[in-house]
Design a protein with these regions (language model features):
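Generic secondary-structure signature for well-ordered alpha-helical cores
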Residues: 3-6, 27, 61-64, 100-108, ...
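Gly/charged contiguous loops adjacent to phosphate- or pyrophosphate-bearing nucleotide/cofactor binding elements
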Residues: 96-158
């Protein structure tokens, strides 16, 4: 990211089971970490899977017809993985896309609860828990319908609230408003696939211009390679380490209040997310196969 070489303030976030966050510039750095990604892991959502060919990674919902357009991860070389079989499940970035689109289309409300009139026949109930059909059995690669449960949505909302609260807490600690952030670097294999527009829509990350967000990929592997291949890089790592002040989130008195406020879509304070417009949004699907369901 080279954030330690510039005067402007940047964020660096590694999103996984935990969120590791650094804010700062060439003169100072502050870091913290907290649990923010459990709901995004494979196996947590009913249809959750690791990112792989044939897995849903993007969703668009037409707000007028509530028709779904599903994007899946292609095979290497760009061949559609779902050419001979339907989607197998959904990865974390696809889940963020899906919930974002459900909210924009009015199929879930501010608390993430299903709106029956908007969901129509897609919504069923089992043991008192709502399930929304995303892909019908005849179109899925498993032969079973791929569904999103109310429990899945509730888990994602807790995770996104934790992520936003971590960012808010560390920014408040150093008295830097989000609008003063010049670059927001997203690291980690999973974090690199998140659609920033969708993450903003659900209130997971700040409502900043999309060009603020920069995907870095697997920075831990790249950093380890640099350290192994160059003495100067090793010295730089030690210098950066010594610059960092660590913030303990578990002793922060305001954290739980901020967390409670963030457990809504996108937030209890809608002024924090002026670009999020319900019943619409940026309805584009990234590269991959598109399947109307």
């Amino acid at each position: 990211s080279k954030m330690t070489e510039h005067e402007g303030v940047s964020f660096l976030v590694d999103v996984g089971t935990n969120a590791e966050v650094v804010i700062g510039n060439r003169d100072w750095l502050m870091a913290c970490a907290g649990a923010a990604g459990p709901a995004l892991e494979s196996g947590v959502a009913d249809m959750g899977m690791m990112a792989a060919p044939g897995v849903i990674d993007s969703v668009v919902i037409n707000p007028h017809t509530v028709a779904f357009t599903i994007g899946t991860i292609p095979e290497r070389g760009g061949t559609p993985a779902t050419e001979n079989r339907g989607p197998m499940g959904i990865c974390g970035s696809g889940l963020i896309d899906l919930v974002s689109q459900l909210f924009l289309a009015g199929m879930i409300d501010l608390m993430g609860k299903f709106v029956p009139d908007r969901c129509g026949e897609r919504l069923t109930e089992t043991d008192g828990i709502g399930h929304l059909m995303v892909v019908p059995a005849e179109a899925s690669g498993t032969g079973e319908p791929l569904t999103l449960s109310q429990i899945d949505i509730d888990g994602l909302i807790r995770s996104k609230a934790a992520m936003y609260t971590i960012l808010t807490t560390i920014a408040k600690t150093v008295n830097i408003p989000f609008e003063d952030i010049g670059r927001f670097f997203v690291a980690g294999t999973f974090g690199s696939y998140i659609n920033p527009r969708s993450a903003i829509n659900i209130g997971m990350i700040p409502d900043l211009p999309l060009n603020t967000y920069v995907s870095l990929g697997n920075t831990s592997l790249a950093g380890a390679t640099m350290a192994l291949l160059g003495v100067d890089a090793q010295k730089s790592l030690f210098h950066i380490r010594d610059q960092i002040t660590y913030l303990e989130l578990n002793v922060n008195q305001e954290f739980m209040n901020l967390f409670s406020a963030a457990k809504f879509l996108p937030h209890t304070d809608r002024s924090l997310f002026p670009s999020v417009k319900r019943w619409g949004g940026d309805n584009t699907v990234p590269a991959g196969e598109k399947i109307g369901v």
